[in-house]
Amino acid sequence: MDLFRKPKKRNAPVVRKKESSSDEDQDSEVKDVIQKRRRTNPMVQSTKQLDASTRRADNSSDDSDDSDDNQDIAVATHSFAASGDAGPSGPRDQGATATLEVDTDYSHDAQAQFERVQQQLKEGVEKDGKILYKGSALYGAKEAKDTAKGNAASGYNRVGPVRAPQFLRQTVRWDFAPDICKDYKETGFCTFGDSCKFVHDRSDYKHGWEIDEEYEAGKYGAEDDANYEIHEGDDTFPEDCFICGNPFVDPIVTKCKHYFCTGCALKSFQKSSKCPICQQNTENIMNTAKELLTYLKRKKQQQKQEAEKQEEEKDSDDDEKPHECDDHHHHDHEDEPEEPENDSNVPEAEEKSDEEQEIMMEDVEGLEGGENDSESDDDDAEKD
């Protein structure tokens, strides 16, 4: 049995909207709405999230209800026309000549007043024997000569307010200690961070003795084309086996891309399945090093071709040497006096010289007063 009786809820009274009798008032009402784009703040979050379906339903209902009202709403939109200039929007000098107008104007500061007084003193106070009045600023004023105040006409060394720099642009230079942070250069990380007094730079540097060597060799500042060469992949292949240190015999390659002789690898893997170089587990997997074999074969062919070229060059040099010797002897003979071409002509010349001597002797015997003449006279006397 219920001791307390619950009261029944009454329905809310239905309020009927009053219809406006005048249609002219509705037409005269114009709403001015400015569309604002709401910016969502990522820091503000709500626990209530609506489903996509409910959001679509709400939006559709709102659009249907407001479709009739939006017909008479004047929407104010803001648009800005482009300037049509391809250059920057700021000044052409990028603000290099912009001035700071916070301080006192240069025409009214203490420096300007000092300069005006000095100019008046130079022009002179007296004119036609009369003293001219030029303001209270000249009471007791004297032309500053050979003094610190007079020499410092710029005003930067005087006592009093100093004229501040007018331009906004400034150049800031960070002067680091002449040392490089070793941790940052090697690892790229420093525990001190931005408070480290050493330079955080990972670029390469040269020692002083290296620069001196380049300067003495005449290579200082010259670019080496070899620094920009892209080497082929053949340079990555080793020349000898890592285990035995000898040239490869039936080379194999492991999973970690290391090359060994077949016999050396089998002996090493009997003790441990780890790679002797990188200590990774190879799982005793070995493959034939086809790339290494092709590289070694191509290298042998290149060496053979180079040896043949060297032999050909040596042979050509040997052939050129005898010709050079012949030319040398030829030049020597040209310096010597000319000799008869054939040796057979030498005795003929000697015979000719003997005949000439005999003829000469006969002529001498035929002369008067000679020995032959006396003998002939004796013979004639005996006959008689």
Curated annotation (Swiss-Prot):
Recorded hits in SMART domains, A to Z, give: RING, ZnF_C3H1
Zinc finger boundaries on the chain: RING-type: 241-279
Ranges of biased composition (kind: Acidic residues): 60-71, 351-384
Q: Does the keyword Metal-binding apply?
A: yes
Taxonomic superkingdom: Eukaryota
Q: Where is this region: Disordered?
A: 1-96, 299-384
Example of a GO MF term? zinc ion binding
Q: Which Pfam families match?
A: zf-C3HC4_3, zf-CCCH
> What pathway is this protein said to act in by its record?
Protein modification; protein ubiquitination
Residue ranges, compositional bias (Polar residues):
42-52
Compositional bias of kind Basic and acidic residues: 303-312, 320-334
Q: Where are the zinc fingers (C3H1-type)?
A: 175-203
> One biological-process term from Gene Ontology?
snoRNA splicing
Report the top EC class in one word.
Answer: transferase
This protein's GO cellular component annotations are: nucleus; U2-type spliceosomal complex
- List all Basic residues biased stretches: 1-11
Q: Which UniProt keywords apply?
A: DNA damage, DNA repair, Metal-binding, Transferase, Ubl conjugation pathway, Zinc, Zinc-finger
Looking up PROSITE patterns in the UniProt record yields:
ZF_C3H1, ZF_RING_1, ZF_RING_2
Query: Known EC number(s)?
Result: 2.3.2.27
Q: Does the keyword Transferase apply?
A: yes
Q: Which reaction does it catalyse?
A: S-ubiquitinyl-[E2 ubiquitin-conjugating enzyme]-L-cysteine + [acceptor protein]-L-lysine = [E2 ubiquitin-conjugating enzyme]-L-cysteine + N(6)-ubiquitinyl-[acceptor protein]-L-lysine
Role according to the record: May function as E3 ubiquitin-protein ligase that catalyzes the transfer of ubiquitin onto target proteins. May play a role in DNA repair via its role in the synthesis of 'Lys-63'-linked polyubiquitin chains that recruit proteins involved in repair to sites of DNA damage by alkylating agents.
Q: What is this protein called?
A: Probable E3 ubiquitin-protein ligase rnf113
Organism of origin is: Caenorhabditis elegans
Q: Which gene encodes it?
A: rnf-113
